[in-house]
Amino acid sequence: MKHLHRFFSSDASGGIILIIAAALAMLMANMGATSGWYHDFLETPVQLRVGALEINKNMLLWINDALMAVFFLLIGLEVKRELMQGSLASLRQAAFPVIAAIGGMIVPALLYLAFNYSDPVTREGWAIPAATDIAFALGVLALLGSRVPLALKIFLMALAIIDDLGAIIIIALFYTSDLSIVSLGVAAFAIAVLALLNLCGVRRTGVYILVGAVLWTAVLKSGVHATLAGVIVGFFIPLKEKHGRSPAKRLEHVLHPWVAYLILPLFAFANAGVSLQGVTMDGLTSMLPLGIIAGLLIGKPLGISLFCWLALRFKLAHLPQGTTYQQIMAVGILCGIGFTMSIFIASLAFGNIDPELINWAKLGILIGSLLSAVVGYSWLRARLNAPA
């Protein structure tokens, strides 16, 4: 029990469980005895009916649309906390990670487009390498223990949170299907109710969650991706403390283990099971996986390092105290671990086009993320051991 408690207390535990879930999915998807069960599980129909309202989806879509909305709720809470009280609370504090995140989104997307611009279908996946898996990246960073400066960890967290916020905006603007005006109207009404609750000082989290469930259903039916409802709810839950209690912080504390140890591993298990049957060298070296691998492994660190250098060169920001530029470059490589967020965007980009494209995209994401984890860990370990 002592070892188990120590494991779950470690920052690396979430990343390790993610790796195990993804490896298990790959194993089950490629073994004759389990591949059928794995795919049957994902295709299991699950129906929810409340009066005249009916939602009928398979298990995979419930995981991607409903459970991931809880993950995005946590992201919304974290972004709000950082903007109001944390490392993004002032322009001076926020400048360096914000500039780094912008570079870390623009350059990977451009590099992906350099490989795929001529193909109007695969071009739709331009945002795939722009994402960072915060849990995985922090998990790899935690493997280096107390040698990692606290300022470097805070920089990675702030960068990844801004990256997630960018991914949310990208999903809302570029990966939205045909819109239902009626459902959008219901969603707008639900948002107005959330705003009113916040303005009136309502601090019962359950009320926000109840209205959030209505918002999630309306957004799901509207054509906008339902996970965005989670972020919106997170922004409206009160953060200010009263009698020593903050509803937003309390909910964040409650959600964190559920997201880290259940929701994200379940998402990884449901989405990382890529069948290797029929995989050829020609396929692996096609523009789609190559663009993703290049975007994650080269584009991410290049964009972050370049934009950080420009920020320092023109005195727009300063290095976090106790860190070096070489360490920032290593963190840039770790940000190439796209994994869950990249897979999520790939499912939106190609989900209604061709399942085979999703498979090739997932392979590119898995290879690019794994290489980024290994190279980033090795580079940062060498930089931390290097004399100052």
Swiss-Prot record:
One GO-annotated biological process of the protein: regulation of pH
GO molecular function, one term: sodium:proton antiporter activity
Membrane topology note: Multi-pass membrane protein
Coiled coil: none
Matching InterPro entries: Na/H_antiporter_dom_sf, NhaA
Keywords, in A-Z order: Antiport, Cell inner membrane, Cell membrane, Ion transport, Membrane, Sodium, Sodium transport, Transmembrane, Transmembrane helix, Transport
Compartment(s) of residence: Cell inner membrane
Entries under Gene3D superfamilies matching the protein: Na+/H+ antiporter like domain (1.20.1530.10)
Catalytic activity: Na(+)(in) + 2 H(+)(out) = Na(+)(out) + 2 H(+)(in)
Pfam family, one: Na_H_antiport_1
Transmembrane segments: 14-34, 59-79, 95-115, 125-145, 154-174, 179-199, 219-239, 254-274, 292-312, 328-348, 360-380
GO CC annotations on file: plasma membrane
NCBIfam families in alphabetical order: NhaA, PRK09560.1, PRK09561.1
Function: Na(+)/H(+) antiporter that extrudes sodium in exchange for external protons.
Family as reported in the entry's similarity comment: Belongs to the NhaA Na(+)/H(+) (TC 2.A.33) antiporter family.
PANTHER family: NA(+)_H(+) ANTIPORTER NHAA, SODIUM ION/PROTON ANTIPORTER NHAA-RELATED
Protein name listed in UniProt: Na(+)/H(+) antiporter NhaA
